[in-house]
From Swiss-Prot:
The keyword Nucleotide-binding does not apply. Keywords: Chromosome, Chromosome partition, Cytoplasm, Meiosis, Nucleus, Phosphoprotein. The modification Phosphoserine is found at residue 11. Component of linear elements (LinEs), which are similar to synaptonemal complexes, at least composed of rec27, rec25, rec10 and mug20. Interacts with rec10; the interaction is direct. The gene is rec25. During meiotic DNA recombination, binds to and may help activate DNA double-strand break (DSB) hotspot sites. The keyword Mitochondrion does not apply. The lineage of its organism: Eukaryota, Fungi, Dikarya, Ascomycota, Taphrinomycotina. This is Linear element protein rec25. It is found in: Cytoplasm; Nucleus; Chromosome.
Amino acid sequence: MVKGSVTNTSSIVKQFEKSSIKHETETIAFAKQFINECIREFQEQKDNVVEEKNTDQNHQNQNQEGVIIEIYQELLQKVDLISSELRQNLSSLQLRFQEVERDTGHDLLNVLNSLSQEARLAQKVLEEDGSQQGSQLIQGLLTCFQSTGN
């Protein structure tokens, strides 16, 4: 009973950790890919600005500055979206960890209560049999369980 509960809880925690790591890795990979695409787009725009600047200096500079500003604004918006998504994911992870901790703690308390009840029953059986050493052993176990339960 105890091993099953602990194994089940351990399995849930491991599955959650794997899922969290996978999601985090995917999010980081997406962010890196996005940043690389933005850098590439920016470099292309920069190259275009240099080419056009040589042909029509004044007019092209004004147009390209506007394009660069738009690109920067789009980049900032995308970075804000990624940041927001990462904050949401972190919040979700924190909630899931709290749920696992709460469930695990509840399971452990149930196990301790069950063990305490079984120890009391064993003490009654030993007291009826008159075994002094067994009774002392069970009394010691009860004391241990009661101190860990508090």
